[in-house]
């Protein structure tokens, strides 16, 4: 599966040339990136490979049965910040994102709408690519559909069966389940107690009441074929993969048995990330799949949780079709911390557009290399501290107010790029490299 087109990303400046009577300035080196890890319940440094290899990041992608809403955008915006920061700091990154193009919600929506599920998946994946391009999200090195990796899933399920970490349920449909007790560390990622796990497992796609399972919390690895459902051949019988093992196979086959960051929305904390880690660890014989498990908060709309069931989704494509600047959508999402549940409204978007206009007016007239170096150092410091974007916005607001006041800016007229000073160009490049926002 092909990814989307990459935006141009300027190099983060290491120094700023002199401007008129203002001397040149050095930009401080980017501090190490520290992110909150759900498993360890603390903010800690992202571990970099000892051999200088690229930092491995796996982010769970869409199930392509509907358009990209702001909840999706907030998640991919967050991990784009991580990706951009690491690259600006001089590190290589291998970013992997899946598409769950084999799953019940997709089949159900296609059946409801009377369309082929494959065509629906293709259509929505194409729209997702368009939305990511509009938002200037860096494309993953590997953008992978589940259908492309059935052989990898079959291999992992076979390994789990051979190790005794999986078993076949007797009955009309010989489904295969993972024995969640096989790995002693099961539960470390979410840190939930069993009662909470049982409740969420039932709410989020699990089948605790399935007869023949050894334990209610054992998760489906392979669903034996049912009439009318898609199927793929496997040594243990035709069928289709479970959700969690898809991500386990895709991640480990591209990033190795252990990698730096597993990411997604907070609703994936359990069961999805718990089980995908458990499947990978059981198959590979490791204690921990990812060094960080990073989760983004939920987005509400006008005070109500945004959800497909409520039908109150705000779609990226609809906002851009109305003429809103995609950069303003990003800035609006930066107004809240990525781990917090936060609200989206017309007011948030309007404030973001106003804020962006002020930044652009100030950036166009910036002529002080030392001030630019200080602003970039402060911004990188906030980003390094668990992606503290609200503090980044405050820093840029204060900077813009000072610049605009000093030049008496009115109407936010933007100087053409060709006429800008070296300080202005360095600031623009730095913010674009880090935030994906052109000022």
Swiss-Prot record:
Binds 1 zinc ion per subunit. Gene3D superfamilies: Anticodon-binding domain of a subclass of class I aminoacyl-tRNA synthetases, HUPs. It holds the Pfam family tRNA-synt_1e. It comes from the Bacteria. GO terms for molecular function: ATP binding; cysteine-glucosaminylinositol ligase activity; cysteine-tRNA ligase activity; zinc ion binding. A motif ('HIGH' region) lies at residues 62-72. Transmembrane segments: none annotated. A motif ('ERGGDP' region) lies at residues 203-208. Its EC number is 6.3.1.13. One of its GO terms (biological process) is mycothiol biosynthetic process. CDD domains: CysRS_core. Keywords: ATP-binding, Ligase, Metal-binding, Nucleotide-binding, Zinc. It catalyses: 1D-myo-inositol 2-amino-2-deoxy-alpha-D-glucopyranoside + L-cysteine + ATP = 1D-myo-inositol 2-(L-cysteinylamino)-2-deoxy-alpha-D-glucopyranoside + AMP + diphosphate + H(+). L-cysteinyl-5'-AMP binds at residues 60-63, 75, 98-100, 243, 265-267, 299. Its cofactor is Zn(2+). Monomer. HAMAP family: MshC. Belongs to the class-I aminoacyl-tRNA synthetase family. MshC subfamily. Catalyzes the ATP-dependent condensation of GlcN-Ins and L-cysteine to form L-Cys-GlcN-Ins. This is L-cysteine:1D-myo-inositol 2-amino-2-deoxy-alpha-D-glucopyranoside ligase 2. It comes from Corynebacterium urealyticum (strain ATCC 43042 / DSM 7109).
